[in-house]
């Protein structure tokens, strides 16, 4: 089953890459740009077929993909042009001016990438990452609204029998200890709380807020027990808890009064509505952006995990090999098949979200770097027009290729470090 999970992730990976490149391909053709190649993978070609003026194929190493567009860069002083790969890694070994001059055919003068208006070039380069974002959103919504996610529910897991300090064992209740509000009200394990103080809710966070907001109050609590609705009455205890700021962070040394009922909630798989799903995805995108920004700070710990005896944290950067291992572990978990499928779909969705964010970095040779170049050209031309100066012409992105080589070199080193860590000290979910 472990191997099956890895194979399934590889299929998801290939589809995600093909889907990304399809975004570039479709928009390039829509704007009349000639695309000689559409390839999934690198290395030797396993299969290819030419349709129209594009060769479609699959290569042996399934760790990337690319399309080739004619005239990616403006011609140099000698008037020569080239076709360049959209793949960052393949682009490292291509000369920005001369490698594909021979691919130009009669009539290509009107089918060059750099001759398209900047907004069209932005669309072509953005289309690839955008396809990954769309796929991630669709997969997330499928799981959230179709399967649900594991979260705390309003069902009672256990009831505290007495009110004691947090440092004491809740199972050791002395006769002198006061009964907890939940126990005094007759709340039992298995009860599903339907309403609190007249407010009906099936959301744990909302229920928790209602309890905290009513210290010292006598409130009715409606529960479902064995298919019947029962109204209990609880006197909410007063508790002093640490104050939190607007971001949910604890404010040191400050406390507030909050209500306490005295029970633990059960965890269950809960389907989300559309609004809840959008909120959840927004939080995950924010987390992904924060993790991307924190990558440089995590490199020392990653190095220690790969070459030392440091632990591999759950939020450690993970590459394709590490994600494939996680896919294999999911397939071996002793959980229902539907839950395995949901976890696997979430893994592929997260991978696509990462692809979107990573490719949008405004650095060559990534898609975001070409987008930044097109936007800069648009700004230069607009400024020249306002100031009534001569049109400066296309922005020569090829001049930034030395920077692109440095960026690509850093990416390669980081990828190798992650690969070693994924092999010798992988992130585990079990």
Curated annotation (Swiss-Prot):
Indicate the segments forming the PDZ domain, all copies: 146-227
Active-site residues, as the UniProt record annotates them: 21
Annotated EC:
3.4.24.-
Q: Which GO terms describe its cellular component?
A: plasma membrane
SMART domains, sorted: PDZ
Q: Main location per UniProt?
A: membrane
The membrane topology noted for this protein in its Swiss-Prot or TrEMBL record is: Multi-pass membrane protein
For this entry, the protein name equals: Putative zinc metalloprotease SCO5695
Species annotation = Streptomyces coelicolor (strain ATCC BAA-471 / A3(2) / M145)
The organism's taxonomic lineage, starting at the top: Bacteria, Bacillati, Actinomycetota, Actinomycetes, Kitasatosporales
């Amino acid at each position: 089953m472990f191997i099956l999970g890895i194979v399934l992730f590889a299929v998801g990976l290939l589809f995600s890459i093909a889907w990304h490149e399809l975004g570039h391909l479709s928009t390039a053709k829509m704007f009349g740009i000639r695309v000689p190649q559409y390839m999934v993978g690198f290395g030797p070609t396993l299969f290819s077929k030419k349709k129209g003026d594009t060769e479609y194929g699959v290569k042996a190493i399934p760790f990337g993909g690319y399309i080739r567009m004619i005239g990616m860069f403006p011609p140099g002083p000698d008037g020569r042009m080239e076709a360049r790969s959209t793949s960052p890694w393949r682009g490292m070994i291509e000369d920005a001016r001369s490698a594909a001059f021979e691919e130009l055919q009669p009539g290509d003068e009107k089918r060059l990438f750099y001759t398209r208006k900047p907004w069209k070039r932005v669309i072509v380069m953005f289309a690839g990452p955008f396809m990954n974002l769309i796929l991630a959103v669709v997969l997330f919504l499928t799981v959230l609204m179709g399967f649900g996610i594991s979260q705390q529910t309003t069902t009672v897991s256990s009831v505290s029998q007495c009110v004691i300090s947090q440092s004491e064992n809740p199972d050791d209740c002395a006769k002198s200890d006061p009964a907890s509000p939940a126990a005094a009200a007759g709340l039992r394990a298995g009860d599903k709380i339907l309403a609190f103080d007249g407010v009906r809710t099936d959301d744990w966070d909302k229920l928790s807020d209602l309890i905290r907001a009513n210290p010292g109050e006598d409130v009715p609590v409606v529960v479902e027990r064995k298919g019947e609705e029962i109204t209990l009455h609880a006197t909410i205890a007063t508790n002093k808890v640490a104050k939190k700021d607007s971001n949910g962070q604890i404010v040191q040394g400050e406390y507030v009064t909050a209500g306490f009922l005295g029970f633990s909630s059960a965890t269950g798989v809960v389907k989300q509505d559309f609004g809840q799903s959008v909120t959840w995805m927004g939080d995950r995108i924010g987390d992904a952006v924060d993790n991307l920004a924190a990558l440089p700070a995590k490199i020392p710990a990653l190095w220690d995990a790969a070459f030392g005896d440091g632990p591999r944290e759950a939020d450690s950067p993970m590459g394709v090999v590490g994600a494939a291992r996680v896919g294999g572990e999911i397939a071996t978990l002793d959980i229902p098949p539907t839950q395995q499928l949901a976890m696997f779909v979430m893994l592929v969705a997260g991978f696509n979200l990462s692809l979107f964010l990573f490719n949008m970095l405004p650095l060559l040779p990534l898609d975001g770097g070409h987008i930044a170049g097109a936007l800069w050209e648009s700004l230069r031309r607009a400024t020249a027009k306002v100031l009534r100066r001569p049109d400066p012409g296309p922005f020569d992105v090829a001049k930034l290729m030395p920077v692109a080589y440095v960026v690509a070199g850093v990416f390669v080193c980081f990828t190798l470090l992650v690969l070693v860590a994924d092999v010798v000290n992988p992130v585990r979910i079990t």
